[in-house]
UniProtKB/Swiss-Prot annotation:
The record marks 31, 80 as: Important for tRNA non-discrimination. One of its GO terms (cellular component) is cytoplasm. Residues 563-597 are annotated as: Disordered. Residues 575-597 have a biased composition (Basic and acidic residues). The lineage of its organism: Bacteria, Bacillati, Actinomycetota, Actinomycetes, Mycobacteriales. It is found in: Cytoplasm. This is Aspartate--tRNA(Asp/Asn) ligase. ATP binds at residues 216-218, 225, 482, 534-537. It comes from the Bacteria. Keywords: Aminoacyl-tRNA synthetase, ATP-binding, Cytoplasm, Ligase, Nucleotide-binding, Protein biosynthesis. Belongs to the class-II aminoacyl-tRNA synthetase family. Type 1 subfamily. L-aspartate binds at residues 170, 216, 448, 489. It catalyses: tRNA(Asx) + L-aspartate + ATP = L-aspartyl-tRNA(Asx) + AMP + diphosphate. Residues 194-197 are annotated as: Aspartate.
């Protein structure tokens, strides 16, 4: 080894010892001919001092981020010079020998400052030398180890599934990779290991896990990455409660890393209740504002806007004191979410109602409205009217915005909930409106994915009444973030084919796209289920960071660009020719048949 000790490990008990340290020059200070440097390595920082001799002469040329090796004697710092902010703040290293291992060019940004995102990603290798980014990456490693420890106790088998596979759409677009040896044919990068882990269950593995890389070619969305990581788990001969029990054990182990004990069992909430009360299937339960349904209350209203299939309200505590410009800003906020606006009523201090909506209501409606929605004098009541799903979603978003503006969220709190009994299917138009790819050609598509089993009570009727069918699925939500989702899977070919049929996938297409899975079900496929955790999001939550980019070693921008390597990039004409990108499908099929023959 080039060093005897880590820079961050030195303490008073090392005084008098000769040590060799390696690392980077974080700072250099010159005090009356005596040079001090903060020497940083992965473990922390130690102060090195150059007082005399050849090493002191050499130290004059040191600059920020020079990579160096120093040898010297550990000494107690003089009284009054201690640094209580550093674990090594009681000591310093009196350097006798200095070796510059590598010089550094002038820095594009100072590491003790907060540069812009573009600069950070362009020079990510420098960004990772900073304490925050480095801590996030090391925390991620500990998270991986903690999960593996739990799964090892339960005798799970870690299996690597293919990353070059067949295009089998799962709710987003595939990244495609040309097969050079079969021009015109393409591999797809997996959106998840879903089908392979089910095949592992058919293969008798019984308990599988993988820290899996996944790829989805999605349109631009805030804080999404085209490649991301899941902790993927599958188990044979289990029911929903078994998967949830294991998942909670893993979550408890992860949050212990930051000193928090998750109370278990984690409460359950049905999808229908979550949408009704919070307007979201991933509700943030750290604050208590809820949606109040007002459809029945306004059933005879003279106000045409509220003559709608659904009317709901959410209260903003103290919101009546907002100036007009802020109330106008709420309208713009709603329009950005596809709504026409956000109706509101102000509850005055004397209990009377103000605002443009109030004068359109009947006397009886005005009289009882504050009580009905739970508003107090000084509050503002926001309303949404129209189709229930869209209006609840708008009010759910308003609920979160209210909490942020009013300061209702305890940033140190953790709130977990399981969302269960989600619909098995949703209208295909709803999926495409939210930016997903609707699998199939029917009016219906899967809410989770096409391999989720119906609940037992929906098994006989899901294809005749798709809108009422419930999924045997469960999602885990933390502080308004979906951090994992799973389901009991379909393990019978006839049920899987019925699900495909509801989605408009006929027998021929099903065999073409998913025949390998359907064929496997014919050989005694066991009942099975599992869960996948969003690993990037979980690590970001544990690290107290808002963006998953902060916990990925080399992330891309929101638009899928890597400023470090300039990916994606054009390819040469020769590469294009070799990849067979311009080969026609019929030519590819002939070539494939020839090779098979």
């Amino acid at each position: 080894m080039l060093r005897t000790h880590l820079a961050g490990s030195l303490r008073s008990e090392h005084a008098g010892q000769t040590v060799t340290l390696t690392g980077w020059v974080a700072r250099r200070r010159d005090h009356g001919g005596v040079i001090f440097i903060d020497l940083r390595d992965a473990s922390g920082v130690s102060q090195a001092v150059f007082r005399e001799g050849e090493a002191a002469e050499q130290a004059h040329r040191l600059r920020a981020e020079y990579c160096v090796r120093v040898t010297g004697v550990v000494e107690q710092r003089p009284d009054g010079n201690e640094n209580p902010e550093l674990p090594t703040g009681q000591i310093e290293v009196n350097v006798r020998e200095l070796e510059v291992l590598n010089e550094s060019a002038p820095l594009p940004f100072q590491l003790d400052e907060q540069p812009g995102e573009e600069a950070r990603l362009k020079h990510r290798y420098l960004d990772l030398r900073r304490e925050g980014p480095a801590h996030a990456i090391r925390l991620r490693s500990k998270v991986n180890a903690a999960a593996r420890e739990v799964l090892a106790r339960h005798e799970f088998v870690e299996v690597e599934t293919p990353t070059l596979t067949k295009s089998t759409p799962e709710g987003a677009r595939d990244f495609l990779v040309p097969a050079r040896l079969q021009p015109g044919n393409f591999y797809a990068l997996p959106q998840s290991p879903q089908l392979f882990k089910q095949l592992l269950m058919v293969g008798g593995i019984e308990r599988y896990f993988q820290i899996a890389r996944c790829y989805r070619d999605e349109d631009f969305r805030a804080d999404r990455q085209p490649e991301f990581t899941q902790l993927d788990i599958e188990m044979s001969f289990v029911e929903q409660a078994d998967v949830i029990l294991l998942a909670e054990e893993i979550l408890v182990a992860l949050w212990k890393l930051i000193g928090y004990e998750i109370p278990t069992p984690i409460p359950h909430m049905t999808y229908a209740e979550a949408m009704r009360r919070f307007g979201s299937d991933k509700p943030d339960l750290r604050f208590g504002v809820e949606i109040t349904e007002c459809t029945e209350y306004f059933k005879n209203t003279p106000f045409r806007v509220f003559q709608a299939p659904y009317v709901g309200a959410v209260v903003m505590p103290g919101g009546a004191s907002q100036p007009r410009r802020q109330l106008d800003a709420w309208q713009e906020w709603a329009k950005q979410r596809g709504a026409k606006g956000l109706a509101y009523v102000l509850v005055n201090e004397d209990g009377s109602l103000g605002g443009p909506v109030a004068k359109n209501l009947s006397d009886a409606e005005r009289e009882g409205l504050a009580k009905h929605v739970g508003a107090e004098p000084g509050d503002c009541v926001f309303f949404a009217a129209g189709p229930a799903k869209a209006q609840r979603a708008l009010l759910g978003a308003a609920r979160g915005e209210i909490a942020r503006k009013v300061g209702l969220i305890d940033e140190n709190a953790w709130s977990f909930v399981w969302i269960v009994d989600a619909p098995l299917f949703e209208p295909a138009d709803d999926a495409t409106a939210s930016g997903d790819v609707a699998l199939g050609h029917s009016a219906w598509t899967a809410v989770h994915h096409a391999f989720t089993s119906p609940k037992p009570e929906s098994l006989d009727t899901f294809d005749t009444d798709p809108g009422s069918a419930l999924a045997y699925a469960y999602d885990i939500v933390c502080n308004g973030n979906e951090i994992g989702g799973g389901s009991i899977r379909i393990h019978r070919r006839d049920v899987q084919e019925r699900v495909f049929k509801v989605m408009g996938i006929g027998e021929q297409e099903a065999q073409e796209k998913f025949g390998f899975l359907l064929d496997a079900f014919a050989y005694g496929a066991p009942p099975h289920g599992g869960i996948a955790f969003g690993w990037d999001r979980i690590v970001a939550l544990l690290a107290g960071l808002d963006s998953i980019r902060e916990v990925i070693a080399f992330p891309k921008t929101g638009g899928g660009v890597d400023p470090l390597t300039d990916a994606p990039a054009p390819i040469t004409a020769q590469q294009r020719k070799e990849a067979g990108l311009d080969a026609k499908p019929e030519q590819a099929e002939v070539k494939k048949a020839e090779q098979a023959g």
